[in-house]
Amino acid sequence: MANSDEIHYDLVEDDEFDIVNIVVEGLDETSIHSPPPSVSAATHGGVKNPSFSQRRTSGRHDFQKWLHEELGKYPAKTHAQKVVEELDAPKSGLIYLRGFNEPLYPYSDQGPPFRQQRHFFYLSGADFPGCAVTYDIPRQHLIVWIRRNDPRLSLWYGTTPSIEEVKSKSDVSDVRYIDDVTKYLHANLTPDTTLFLLHPDQTPKLEPPSLNLRHRFKGPKIDTTSLLPAIEAARVIKTPHEISLIRRAVALTSLAHRMVLQRIKHLSNEREAHAVFEGFCISQGAPRQSYAVIAASGANASTLHYEANDQPLEGKQTMLLDAGCEWGCYASDVTRTFPLKGKWTKEGEEIYKVVERMQRETIDAIRPGRLYYKLHLVACLVAVEELMKLGILHNGTRTEILAKGTVAAFFPHGLGHHVGLEVHDVSGRERLLLSSSSSSGLSRQAISGSRRLPPPRNMKREQVTPEDLAAMYREAMMDTAGDEVEQSAVAPPPPYRGRQRLKENMVVTVEPGIYFHRPYIQSFFLSNPDHAKYINTKVLDRYWDVGGVRIEDCILVTKDGYENLTTAPKGKEALKIINAGIPGFPCDGKA
């Protein structure tokens, strides 16, 4: 089938399975193994959407067949080779990583669900506890080391994957029992070998003490500083296998968002929206979320990482649903904002259209070579223009207000981040937007009375303060060459240090938002004459009840442009689904 990479589908209602029935264009038995379908997926940059002469209805079975199809072995050896390229390793070297063990809460025999160390998984594909991995650089020999199955433990917890099962799922040179890893290290580490570790604490200890690696090797022979940046740099550009897993995570997440839209008129509390989303993901084989679900109604939507999800929906205008499941340890990240009753208030619709334009214009600008921070500035410029039209911002030109950073009162976070094994994935040797030392920002300094506050919990988006935004603007004004031309290596002044360019096969989010968080705006903008003069409080008073609007999609950077992987309904399509609704409650036997 020509252009089988692009399969488009829409969900249709059926008496039995309303949520997962799919109208598929061009899907037949030969195309079921093609890259994942996408609802109205946007692909731009010289790639034409295919047209198909045949359409047929396909139900739950076909979607699940595609979702669960075998993708081949996890490319662990390819990943190891990518790491070595970034490592610039000597001819004689060996990489050694330990995976995680089962976690326990302090002073308890219980613990959270197991979650594998992501750098370890990248080099092994082993998503279970008690493992290690070694990579002999000159021999290109990758070994995963696993525990033996203990019948006493299997009685309680079941068996862990066998040597044969690990070999069948991961492209590795060998799989062995971890009992023998010490013997292997002793045999393969010579005075000429450099042992690469993530951290000094991971230095293996050999017995007797005279064989301890800390004793045998000194100085540069144990390298605990080079491996971490090398792995993080390698993870930035995704392999085709990784992209396939992210596609599935985003596709399932998009269906779960649609599920919530279909049910929302029948729900009465934020927790029910949370339950519908997460329950659908679990039912389709995705028990883990990439991050804690945010189901924020009304003013709660102005809290960026709202966690309670326990407030009644009665009397609220909108819901902001930020949720994404994992698939095969790879994350998704999608946000939709919608009116709970299927019809916007005047103020809510106005703000939604602002954010809609912010996202549309930034996504349309994505292509390889683009400086990501300039996309953030595009979103900010659109926000300034639109908020001036509404009268919320005034008393200055758009350039003046942007240069002051005042729009950060309403758009206080970064445009997006990488997505991969983590929802806020590593960015390599360059920051996508901000340096880690600057991500905590402005007014945190004022809040705490000290230079910085500790990093917040569950932080998956970076704060952008007026100072940060002003620094980005100054940098852009000095950056006279085109986006695709490499600039001087001289770092811009603090706090802004992010100069990462988009490259093919990066996956990033684009998640602009406008928020009306009263304590933040009043404390750090309306009380500051430098910003207060640009904010019309009489007009602003009409918008507090909107809370916040955010729209977030996962974007794959392609050779000539981008592909929007996210197919969750938004805009008019979302309103249509809300108002069509479904009869009954989600547990009535449907979906």
Swiss-Prot record:
Q: Which cofactor does it need?
A: Mn(2+)
Q: Where is the composition biased (Low complexity)?
A: 441-450
Could you tell me the keywords of this UniProt record? Aminopeptidase, Hydrolase, Manganese, Metal-binding, Metalloprotease, Protease
Q: What does this protein do?
A: Catalyzes the removal of a penultimate prolyl residue from the N-termini of peptides.
Cofactor: binding comment: Binds 2 manganese ions per subunit.
Q: Which residues bind Mn(2+) 1?
A: 333, 511, 552
Q: Where is this region: Disordered?
A: 31-59, 441-460
The organism encoding this protein is Sordaria macrospora (strain ATCC MYA-333 / DSM 997 / K(L3346) / K-hell)
Protein's name according to its UniProt entry: Probable Xaa-Pro aminopeptidase PEPP
PANTHER family reported in the protein's UniProt record: XAA-PRO AMINOPEPTIDASE 3, XAA-PRO AMINOPEPTIDASE AN0832-RELATED
Ranges in coiled-coil conformation: none
**A GO molecular-function descriptor:** metalloaminopeptidase activity
Q: Where does Mn(2+) 2 bind?
A: 322, 333, 552
Q: What's the EC number here?
A: 3.4.11.9
**Primary gene name:** PEPP
Q: Which family does it belong to?
A: Belongs to the peptidase M24B family.
Q: Does the keyword Protease apply?
A: yes
Reaction(s) catalysed by this chain's protein: Release of any N-terminal amino acid, including proline, that is linked to proline, even from a dipeptide or tripeptide
